[in-house]
Amino acid sequence: MDLFEYQGKSLYQKFNINHPNSKLIKNLNDLNDPINLNFPVVVKAQVQVGGRGKAGGIKVAKDINELTQYSEEILGMDIKGHKVEILLLEEASNILEEYYISFTLDRSEKKYLIMLSAKGCLLYTSDAADEVVS
């Protein structure tokens, strides 16, 4: 099952798991509606591929001007062959520690695979496999 990040966050809400306040943007006109988020706000491309941050698809906006600018830059962007058609705007969090966990299916071994890293998701997507426990 491939989920966009915002779909996963809707599951958080369903099961009362804390997560930052957010808003979906499907076109730039959506920015005319009240945002109702506290700055800084993270502008996140919604594509089903890793490396969004490195590709410029995740940016932190400190005010409405940056939010508009980053939304214009990211919406419609191509990230590894995936066109960005939806943005997730999310209140930035004060992150003390970051971890990465991924659940997937190893088809060659015919078993489930859980990957963990104490370095956060950027490590995993930066080819530092020696730091990932699976």
Question: Residues of each region from the PLM?
Answer:
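ATP-grasp fold ATP-binding core
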Residues: E5-Y12, L37-G53, G81-I95, I101
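N-terminal, positively charged regions that mediate nucleic acid binding
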Residues: M1-S22
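Short amphipathic alpha-helix with an adjacent loop that forms part of the alpha/beta core around
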Residues: L31-N36
